[in-house]
Structure formats: structure tokens, C-alpha cells
């Protein structure tokens, strides 16, 4: 099973930092998200409103295998 991941994460410069994932996903949020909000469109565009002290790993694979 894939763990939580986030490609676009923003953090404040405070200590500890306050980070939020700004990814938009179809119909769901990452697996660790507690506050997931989705639009009423089809498919739903969902974003996670959680504030954490860290960023999850990026979702995109590190290797360029999109050929």
C-alpha cells in the first residue's frame, strides 16, 4: 500500500514549521489526511487541510520513467 505523499508542500518559517500539502487529487486525499475537503464536481477535486510539522515524501517517482 502506498503511504502518504505530497508534491506541493508549503511550510511557514516558524519553529516548529507549520506545513500544509497543496496537492489537489481526484476523489480522495492522501492516506494520512484527517481533514479532507472535496468539491462537488465529478470527479471531485480534493485537498487536505491538515497542518503538520513536516512534509510527506513527494508522490512523483524520483526516476524519470514517463517516456
From Swiss-Prot:
Keywords: Disulfide bond, Protease inhibitor, Serine protease inhibitor. CDD domains: BBI. PROSITE patterns: BOWMAN_BIRK. One of its GO terms (molecular function) is serine-type endopeptidase inhibitor activity. GO terms for cellular component: extracellular region. Disulfide bonds join 5-59, 6-21, 9-55, 11-19, 29-36, 33-48, 38-46. The keyword Iron does not apply. Pfam families: Bowman-Birk_leg (PF00228). InterPro entries: Bowman-Birk_prot_inh (IPR035995), Prot_inh_BBI (IPR000877). The record marks 13-14, 40-41 as: Reactive bond for trypsin. Seed. Monomer. Although dimerization may occur in solution. Inhibits trypsin but not chymotrypsin. The inhibitor consists of 2 domains and has 2 sites of interaction with trypsin. Belongs to the Bowman-Birk serine protease inhibitor family. This is Bowman-Birk type proteinase inhibitor 1. It comes from Dioclea glabra.
Amino acid at each position: 500500500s502506498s503511504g502518504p505523499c505530497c508534491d506541493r508542500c508549503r511550510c511557514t518559517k516558524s519553529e516548529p514549521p507549520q506545513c500544509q500539502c497543496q496537492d489537489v487529487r481526484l476523489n480522495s486525499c492522501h492516506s494520512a489526511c484527517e481533514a479532507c475537503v472535496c468539491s462537488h464536481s465529478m470527479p471531485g477535486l480534493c485537498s487536505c487541510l491538515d497542518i503538520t510539522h513536516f512534509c510527506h515524501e513527494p508522490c512523483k517517482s524520483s526516476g524519470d520513467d514517463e517516456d
